């Protein structure tokens, strides 16, 4: 309602100003005389010389008041004339309203004339004065309105509603599946928020800030909410981007207001998501944006030094780019504790899937451990998306329960996108795609350190004509040279199969080459797994030597892949033929095919 009234006032003001200007424009347009303006004496001279070719028009142009005699009203007479040369002139004569103009010159010179007398109108004069007053007043009101609007918007920039982010967290650690070590690290923070005196007595200083670092979707925000929920304290959630504006000083002001509010509601948890936006390294160019960012970070550093541990404020920052943070933000006394939130392992993935499946109707054949095996490297958010997609597919298929069929399709949709069944290959293209995917599968089956095949399909998804779902035999903390070489060979398997069977190659392997080259480059420049030794890539490195070493790794892997493919040509043909028959092959069908091939 408040905004409606403001809008009505604004629109009314605009209309009044428009009408006032319109009236003035019409008045000028109607009464403005034509031609050049001349003096009264010049006009009389032209009449005397009989230079006038048309009739002369006399009219009251406007009414005026004398400054020294307010009640002495004068009419301004307008006289328009046209000469023999078709030149137009006009003149104005001021006379008292009671006086009469002398028209003796015109009849004497046999010039016809018209005289229009408009008597003085108090109503018209008052209306004219009132309209001019309204014009000035409305212009003033409009100016004030614009000024207040700018001031109000400036105030909004300066006090963006960060305080409204205060909430009571309904999450606890029971709502966070996996992340066992991370939850253990944060448990003592709960005790501090509940009983800070216990730590003060011993002289222990609880961390002022906790930095949660990890890939997107691993549950950093959820951990912060669960911490506040377990401790039953207010939870403030803001994003780092909310502090950064183009106007210098705005971000720093927001930081001050946020910490002021947090101190009034201590103990509490203050969560800053994407803190790398706010806390990135200072320096660089001296543009306005950089100055604003630096001032905001300086204010954050000051605020984190400005409250004592006894106030019970724990600042939690979340980022997936900790390497971008300013060193001053990471020193002891600010973000004292750093917790790495990794992607879930197979056990954690199974727990996450079970947690997100609690409110869903599932069939009895659901195997969460098997599904967890098929989802290596997936985050908690992606796993939640898989179950949600499965629920949607169940409704679409008019089923009452979610089955493994829907879960398998949902996994494909999350990883590769929806199936493009409308795309129809010609027989030769379809056969090439089948052999390409079969080539990847053969390497996964026959190479010792390669990832094992879970499913193969030639149904197009996203930009891929088909794909292999492969996973490592066991999850490891790091990768070895043999595993990395085997992975390169797996990527090259599709191209090798095309070359052997068709004596031709397609563009379908472009992403395979990109992935293989990426691994080879890391082996050379980062992991020291080439003939160049352990030297790191830098601006002083010999780029030609690096490229040569990468090419050598790729060429050797290609040769070994080709040799392995020739040895297992029968298995390659059988997998390709089965793919052409049913488009998708499961892990069980692949294992049975391998057994039959050995017989």
Swiss-Prot record:
Its EC number is 3.4.24.-. ATP binds at residues 214-221. One of its GO terms (molecular function) is metalloendopeptidase activity. One of its GO terms (biological process) is proteolysis. Residues 29-128 are extracellular. Its cofactor is Zn(2+). The active site is at 437. InterPro entries: AAA+_ATPase (IPR003593), AAA_lid_3 (IPR041569), ATPase_AAA_core (IPR003959), ATPase_AAA_CS (IPR003960), FtsH (IPR005936), P-loop_NTPase (IPR027417), Peptidase_M41 (IPR000642), Peptidase_M41-like (IPR037219). The chain crosses the membrane at residues 8-28, 129-149. Zn(2+) binds at residues 436, 440, 512. GO terms for cellular component: plasma membrane. Keywords: ATP-binding, Cell membrane, Hydrolase, Membrane, Metal-binding, Metalloprotease, Nucleotide-binding, Protease, Transmembrane, Transmembrane helix, Zinc. Residues 1-7, 150-599 are cytoplasmic. PROSITE patterns: AAA. It is found in: Cell membrane. It comes from the Bacteria. Binds 1 zinc ion per subunit. Gene3D superfamilies: 1.10.8.60, P-loop containing nucleotide triphosphate hydrolases, Peptidase M41. PANTHER family: ATP-DEPENDENT ZINC METALLOPROTEASE YME1L1 (PTHR23076:SF97), METALLOPROTEASE M41 FTSH (PTHR23076). Acts as a processive, ATP-dependent zinc metallopeptidase for both cytoplasmic and membrane proteins. Plays a role in the quality control of integral membrane proteins. Homohexamer. In the central section; belongs to the AAA ATPase family. HAMAP family: FtsH. This is ATP-dependent zinc metalloprotease FtsH 3. It comes from Phytoplasma mali (strain AT). The gene is ftsH3.
């Amino acid at each position: 309602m408040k905004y409606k009234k403001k809008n009505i006032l604004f629109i009314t003001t605009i209309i009044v100003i428009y009408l006032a200007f319109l009236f003035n424009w019409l008045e000028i347009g109607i009464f403005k005389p034509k031609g050049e303006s001349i003096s009264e004496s010049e006009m009389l001279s032209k009449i005397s010389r009989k230079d006038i070719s048309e009739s002369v028009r006399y009219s009251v142009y406007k009414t005026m008041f004398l400054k020294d005699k307010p009640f002495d009203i004068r009419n301004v007479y307008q006289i328009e004339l046209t000469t023999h040369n078709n030149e137009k002139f006009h003149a104005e004569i001021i006379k008292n309203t009671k006086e009469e103009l002398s028209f003796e010159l015109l009849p004497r010179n046999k010039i016809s004339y018209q005289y229009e007398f408009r008597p003085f109108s108090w109503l018209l004069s008052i209306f004219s004065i009132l309209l001019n007053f309204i014009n000035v007043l409305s212009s003033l009101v409009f100016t004030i309105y614009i000024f207040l609007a700018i001031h109000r918007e400036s105030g909004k920039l300066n006090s963006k509603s960060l305080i409204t982010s205060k909430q009571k967290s309904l999450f606890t650690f029971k709502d966070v599946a996996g992340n066992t070590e991370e939850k253990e690290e944060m448990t003592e923070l709960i005790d501090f928020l509940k009983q800070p005196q216990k730590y003060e007595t011993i002289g222990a200083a609880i961390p002022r800030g906790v930095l949660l670092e990890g890939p997107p979707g691993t549950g950093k925000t959820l951990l912060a909410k669960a911490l506040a929920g377990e401790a039953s304290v207010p939870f403030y959630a803001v994003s780092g981007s909310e502090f950064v504006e183009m106007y210098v000083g705005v971000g720093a002001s927001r930081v001050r207001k946020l910490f002021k509010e947090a101190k009034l509601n201590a103990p509490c948890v203050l969560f800053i998501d994407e803190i790398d936006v706010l806390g990135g390294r200072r320096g660089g160019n001296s543009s306005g944006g950089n100055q604003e960012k630096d001032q905001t970070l300086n204010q954050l550093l000051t605020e984190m030094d400005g409250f004592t541990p006894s106030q019970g404020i724990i600042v939690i920052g979340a980022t997936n780019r900790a390497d971008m943070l300013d060193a001053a933000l990471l020193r002891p006394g600010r973000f004292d504790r750093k917790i790495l939130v990794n992607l879930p392992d197979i056990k954690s993935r199974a727990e996450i899937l079970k947690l997100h499946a609690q409110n869903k109707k599932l069939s009895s054949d659901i195997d969460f451990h098997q599904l967890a095996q098929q989802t290596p490297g997936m985050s908690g958010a992606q796993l939640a998306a898989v179950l949600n997609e499965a629920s949607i597919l169940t409704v679409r298929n008019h089923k009452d329960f979610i089955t493994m069929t829907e879960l398998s399709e949902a996994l494909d949709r999350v990883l590769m996108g929806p199936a493009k069944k409308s795309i129809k290959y010609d027989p030769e293209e379809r056969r090439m795609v089948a052999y390409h995917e079969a080539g990847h599968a053969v390497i996964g089956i026959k190479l010792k350190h390669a990832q094992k095949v879970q499913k193969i399909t030639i149904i197009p998804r996203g930009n891929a004509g088909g794909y292999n779902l492969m996973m490592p035999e066991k999850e490891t903390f790091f990768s070895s040279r043999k595993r990395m070489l085997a992975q390169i060979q797996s990527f090259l398997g599709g191209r090798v199969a095309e070359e052997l069977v068709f004596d031709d190659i397609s563009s379908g392997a472009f992403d395979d080459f990109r992935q293989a080259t990426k691994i080879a480059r890391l082996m050379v420049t980062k992991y020291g797994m080439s003939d160049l030794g352990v030297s790191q890539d830098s601006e002083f490195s010999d780029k030609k030597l690096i490229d040569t070493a990468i090419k050598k790794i790729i060429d050797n892997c290609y040769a070994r892949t080709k040799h392995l493919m020739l040895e297992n040509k029968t298995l390659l043909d059988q997998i390709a033929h089965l793919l052409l028959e049913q488009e998708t092959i499961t892990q069980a069908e692949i294992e049975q095919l391998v057994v039959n091939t050995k017989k």
